[in-house]
């Protein structure tokens, strides 16, 4: 019985590349000369450092621009509060969302059940497994989910025949 998983996770290699490109641009830009502006990447977390709130927003703009060029959806980013550190410097922790949340997985299952397509959807941890008798049904479910679920970037993986 064919099946696939609906997941919500960023390509971490592309995130790392986007952070490196953003840091490279920040280090060469004229308006950041002499400032300690940078973006650090650790596991599922990014930390943006800057001299003040304005420069922090500029750092985030550069990061978002580089992520968009690397085809990383910015809806994966969850911005924390801005913290003041030594002197006038500020930092902001940006966490990278991973996995389908409980509410979103329930919404996905409800959309699939309401569509009356002959597939079964089950929540499995941070993914939703969709299985059905025909591959065409699964492809129509994928198209429907791409159209109906806009609050999170969905990926489909773990295809089985």
Curated annotation (Swiss-Prot):
Pfam family, one: DUF520
GO molecular function: nucleotide binding
Alphabetical UniProt keywords: Nucleotide-binding
Keyword Iron: no
Function: Nucleotide-binding protein.
Family: Belongs to the YajQ family.
Stated name of the protein: Nucleotide-binding protein H16_A3060
Organism classification: Bacteria, Pseudomonadati, Pseudomonadota, Betaproteobacteria, Burkholderiales
């Amino acid at each position: 019985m064919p099946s696939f998983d609906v997941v919500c996770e960023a390509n971490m290699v592309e995130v790392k590349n986007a952070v490196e490109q953003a840091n490279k641009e920040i280090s060469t830009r004229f308006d950041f000369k002499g400032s300690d502006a940078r973006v650090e990447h650790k596991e599922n977390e990014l930390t943006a450092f800057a001299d003040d709130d304005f420069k922090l927003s500029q750092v985030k703009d550069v990061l978002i621009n580089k992520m968009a060029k690397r085809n990383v959806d910015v809806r994966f980013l969850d911005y924390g509060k801005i913290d003041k550190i030594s002197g006038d410097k500020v930092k902001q922790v940006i966490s990278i969302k991973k996995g389908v949340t409980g509410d979103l997985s329930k919404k996905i299952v409800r959309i699939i059940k309401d569509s009356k397509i002959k597939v079964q959807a089950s929540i499995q941890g941070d993914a939703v497994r969709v299985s059905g008798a025909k591959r065409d049904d699964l492809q129509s479910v994928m198209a429907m989910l791409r159209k109906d679920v806009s609050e999170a970037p969905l990926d489909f993986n773990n295809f089985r025949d």
